């Protein structure tokens, strides 16, 4: 590959008529020699509002050093983030999923608007990862994602705790099992420093999935935020993206159908977040890879759940790092025929070649169960179907002993109303709590229900009360929960016509989600019901009008699809 080939976009500045453009670039420090090299963007979601992202500006500088040491010119950019843990349970949560697509669009705009030849995207909070990957897939120029790393566990009275411990503490306080002072002690010790939330929650799930896809460096997803390994992998990402340029390696070479199958496989084995379904569908859509909810069920049936990680297990993500990390898990799964070892990754090597350099899981470790004695014989993420969710719904059943729940619905049109019912003991064992009109269009923004689900668990009703919604759940959620119900209420899905007292069935063995309401009664209720108008102001108004169903990834660019489904 020639130097000009490596400058496949920035060479636009070479001509005489681009002298004014170069004048601007010289003010940023570029010299004649720099104009002869590739321009590589380094864009992060740095912000001071959350531990997930507070360190990312410094990480951007490390990535720049890597780019420069590889002979290219680095340029640092910033984009937005919305911190789920801070927005949770507030009106701000409507902006969380919305931010995923804003991040994707802003990265594409900044990188394309400045004609960079390649880029490194650095993220820390939940929507940063899929947002970055949607942009990477859409642009299809050499690019790597670098994760800011997982937070260290907090410690209280010799016991590891995390943010979810505080959410559940509210339920325990309401139930009389904790004092306000107990909760304050949790609050003050749960988050000891920078990094993404520490269990197998959404941030760590998506960072892992991206590593498995082959779009971040091997081992990087499980390096803790404050570790020396993390600083090294961030700098290495800068060097690696220049190597991708030299190889002519693009995301479309890496993001294959087999790559997504492997990402789902590892997500199942580690007990990842329900949000993985939404985000992997969206990334696949951007990459023009055919992926559907049914693919998750197909893989779920053959892949056991091996990881004893929070929220349903006892270990945090840093514990996985200490026994070999994601590469050791992948190596174990590859050796047992679960992964495609021959596909290419961002290193220019295959999955199998990358993993050959890593050690096996530490002998005697207890974070990852053996295939002969898994935590669960099949995967913990299940796609449900039935007359309550004709287009599907997503359940996470890790740690759930109840395989079938049948009970009366208690229907709420907002999370706030449902929370009030829980706090005032209106929800009794056997109930099915339903929160609707909180889907992608109805929210708008499909907010997560961690505040609500954690209160139910904290009150000791996690296995006794089912929680259903057309919204989402945090990766920190566990219990009898079903989200992403589609079609959503705002689109006139059956959940819009469910009434308090209707009997609802959730069965993880038959993968059923149904309501005991006849077609005739349902049609009668439709005729009697007027759906609320779409939200129509600002960014949420735009989002509500263009976002797709959750069953298709809640993406925002479906209007230009041809019959093949390609963009």
Swiss-Prot record:
It holds the Pfam family ILVD_EDD_N. The keyword Ribonucleoprotein does not apply. Keywords: 2Fe-2S, Amino-acid biosynthesis, Branched-chain amino acid biosynthesis, Iron, Iron-sulfur, Lyase, Magnesium, Metal-binding. The keyword Lyase applies. One of its GO terms (biological process) is isoleucine biosynthetic process. Binds 1 [2Fe-2S] cluster per subunit. This cluster acts as a Lewis acid cofactor. The modification N6-carboxylysine is found at residue 127. Pathway: Amino-acid biosynthesis; L-isoleucine biosynthesis; L-isoleucine from 2-oxobutanoate: step 3/4; Amino-acid biosynthesis; L-valine biosynthesis; L-valine from pyruvate: step 3/4. SUPFAM superfamilies: IlvD/EDD N-terminal domain-like (SSF143975), LeuD/IlvD-like (SSF52016). One of its GO terms (molecular function) is magnesium ion binding. Its cofactor is [2Fe-2S] cluster; Mg(2+). [2Fe-2S] cluster binds at residues 52, 125, 197. Functions in the biosynthesis of branched-chain amino acids. Catalyzes the dehydration of (2R,3R)-2,3-dihydroxy-3-methylpentanoate (2,3-dihydroxy-3-methylvalerate) into 2-oxo-3-methylpentanoate (2-oxo-3-methylvalerate) and of (2R)-2,3-dihydroxy-3-methylbutanoate (2,3-dihydroxyisovalerate) into 2-oxo-3-methylbutanoate (2-oxoisovalerate), the penultimate precursor to L-isoleucine and L-valine, respectively. Belongs to the IlvD/Edd family. Homodimer. This is Dihydroxy-acid dehydratase. It comes from Streptococcus pneumoniae (strain CGSP14). The lineage of its organism: Bacteria, Bacillati, Bacillota, Bacilli, Lactobacillales. The gene is ilvD.
